[in-house]
Amino acid sequence: MLVSLSWLKEFVDIDEDAKTIAEGLTMSGSKVEGIKSYGEEISNVVVGQIVSLEKHPNADKLWVGIVDIGSEKLQIVTGAENIKVGAYIPVALHGATLPGGVKIKRSKLRGVESEGMMCSAEELGLDESLLPEYQRNGIFILPPLPLGMDINEALQLKDDVLEFEITPNRPDCLSVVGIARETAATFRKSFRMPEIRVTEVEEPNPARVTIEAPDLCYRYVARVVKNVKIGPSPIWMQVRLLKAGIRPINNVVDVTNYVMLELGQPLHAFDLDKVKNKHIIVRRARDGEKLVTLDGKERILDSSMLVIADEEKAIGLAGVMGGENTEITDSTVNILIESANFKGSNIRHTSKKLGLRSEASARFEKGLDPEITVLACERAAQLMEKYCGGEVLKGIVDEYPKPMERTVLTVRPDRINKFLGTNLATSEMIEILRSLEFEVVEKGEELEIKVPHFRKDVTMEADIAEEIARLYGYNNIEDSLMKNAQTTLGSLTKEQQLEEKAREVLLACGLNEIVTMSFMGERDLDRINVPKDSVLRKAVKIINPLGEEQSLMRTTLLPFMLNVAYTNYSRKVGEFRAFEISRVFLPKELPLKELPEEVKTISLGMYGKEVDFYTIKGVIEELLEVMGIVDVEYVRAEEPSYHPGRSAKILFKEEVLGVFGEVHPDVLENYDLPVRVYAGELNLDKIIKFANVDKKYTPLPKYPAVERDIAVVVDKDLFVAEVEKVIKETGRGFVEKTALFDVYKGPNIPEGKKSVAFSIWYRSYEKTLTDEEVNEVHARIVKALEEKLGAKLR
């Protein structure tokens, strides 16, 4: 954001120089990245008028001009092709200096004396690329101005321009008024808005506005100005636009851009005579609808986009760019000024989808204040009346379906001081907040604060503390020791150590760690088959999202793992094994009244020739074993994201530690993954809660173990864990451990059945077991499997 210091000083009385202002604003949170000075190095350059122009006698590409500078007439030789007799131009006299230390002297060019130099815009320090075609690569053509007037005075050129880095949460600072408000608060000066007075004629405003998409258009204001005369805008306005990096076009368009820079509200001007029945309709685009935008390109739209239309056609892409079919041209007589407020995330989505960004979309997508729309419209009407010769028709159309309510917060000054480590008086806090246009009322030991409409980023007590801190000055807050706070020196907490141990186990199992963003969209949940009434749908919404696909804080890691799996598969990676340790955000209630629960979660994902259900189960078992969590139970999972017969929940002490299994084929189809993918999500917080990593000495067994194999035929849908559970329960006191070594379906196995084979180790810690004792226990296990699970010994 480029802000002219002379423009800034119209709204705040401040005498400090640019450097002091830049330092103060940077310290209060409005970071200044650079300062560019205009006119400082320019001297002895005046306004002149060409009174005659002849070909150079000795050069085909040079001209000899006589230029009147008021006090005298000078002969100047030039090679410019864009000049003519009668043109007003900047003239650098003998002894003049220009930006970059260039000095001008009398000289002879091919035998003809030149007593000065005609100047281009670039030679005056302006960006020539922003000028109209006829002004580029030639002399800067001026409007009629007093001859001999100093060019700095004529163009209001002498100025400093501050370049600000504006963060996305402060769209109110994308304006001169916004920066002026911050300047006034920072330097304890008075702030004033521009004076706006509109003189209306008796003729009523004929425009009508219908908002058909109130979820995307929060407010739409329209004014009509008739009998405008299209021409160049005042030179001072053009120069201000150039300093701000905006191309001057004509007086009407320049006024809309000027007001956008001044107040932060994008405007658009339609040729009213091209709007069918003077009826503006704000609606969603139709799928396949076409619109040629002002850049001359045809855009194919869809129903996710918002358009401004009349009764026949789309005439503008809401918040992004107007349509060519209602463009302001030299023949335009009557105009309609649009000042509207649109949903920021929708504007960002449209802009990104069409690959079309503009100064307007850059502001709208951050979320603007709907309360500024009328003021901006009136300001534009005022300037058009003055500089376009227009007549403002009576009445303003203002469609505002659901007026915005101001946020009201209750804060306690003592908590603010505790939070900041300061000892500020309540009166000082109130003074700071009021300088930022917060309304503050003392109520006992509390402050009731009404947040200004333009400060959507202030939603809680911590935000108020930040406002006070930055205006008080972070550099003024004295260092202090923390009181009553637990600290750890030189080591990780138990939770951090266990998280690191989990990471080491997963890396040792051959998985690669990934890191993904914490934001998701509704589409991510749709793609993994999350039901509409699922708790996972109750996600925290981002106030100023980067787009619809990043509008929520994520409640699951699965979509991100599948995205990474797809990226690897699409790049011909044949074997994929990965994990992520991150947080999911689960709100306790919506709308949000307190911070959501942040659950640390492990996400697993893998595919490949050697990968199956038991591969991912083995990784999980290894992790739990290292964490000292034994005797977990695996039960069938009924999760819509997973294959119903090839997924499981992990239970320990009646709590769910996680879910894993083969990803549902429908979900894989949504991600264009033609291979089987196995995934899982584990609650790391619960794993850490139950972890028991204290090492205990266990003597080596004195007596030998006896190993026996058992293979049984069971229903194909029966979980192997259920077979293992029966074996261990029946053989308690004798069965030391079990290991699955085969699952078989095929010839010699009945339809709907499968063969499951285990190795069983029998051991007593009191004596050596005899064959008879082992046979007896083994037989009991076979019988229990038959009775409880319907198993048949192979």
Swiss-Prot record:
HAMAP family recorded: Phe_tRNA_synth_beta1
EC number(s) stated in the UniProt entry for this protein: 6.1.1.20
Cofactor(s) demanded: Mg(2+)
Major place of residence: cytoplasm
Subcellular location: Cytoplasm
Subunit structure: Tetramer of two alpha and two beta subunits.
UniProt name for this protein: Phenylalanine--tRNA ligase beta subunit
Residues annotated as domain tRNA-binding: 39-152
Annotated B5 domain residues: 404-479
Family per similarity comment: Belongs to the phenylalanyl-tRNA synthetase beta subunit family. Type 1 subfamily.
Database matches in InterPro entries: aa-tRNA-synth_II/BPL/LPL, B3/B4_tRNA-bd, DNA-bd_dom_put_sf, Fdx_antiC-bd, Fdx_antiC-bd_sf, NA-bd_OB-fold, Phe-tRNA-ligase_IIc_bsu, Phe-tRNA-ligase_IIc_bsu_bact
UniProt-annotated binding residues for Mg(2+): 457, 463, 466-467
Gene Ontology CC terms: phenylalanine-tRNA ligase complex
Cross-referenced PROSITE patterns: B5, FDX_ACB, TRBD
Gene Ontology biological process terms in this record: phenylalanyl-tRNA aminoacylation
Cofactor detail note: Binds 2 magnesium ions per tetramer.
Annotated TM spans: none
Keywords: Aminoacyl-tRNA synthetase, ATP-binding, Cytoplasm, Ligase, Magnesium, Metal-binding, Nucleotide-binding, Protein biosynthesis, RNA-binding, tRNA-binding
Molecular function in Gene Ontology: ATP binding; catalytic activity, acting on a protein; magnesium ion binding; phenylalanine-tRNA ligase activity; transferase activity; tRNA binding
Reactions accelerated catalytically: tRNA(Phe) + L-phenylalanine + ATP = L-phenylalanyl-tRNA(Phe) + AMP + diphosphate + H(+)
Organism of origin: Caldanaerobacter subterraneus subsp. tengcongensis (strain DSM 15242 / JCM 11007 / NBRC 100824 / MB4)
Superkingdom to which the source organism belongs: Bacteria
Leader peptide range in chain numbering: none
Annotated ranges, domain FDX-ACB: 701-794
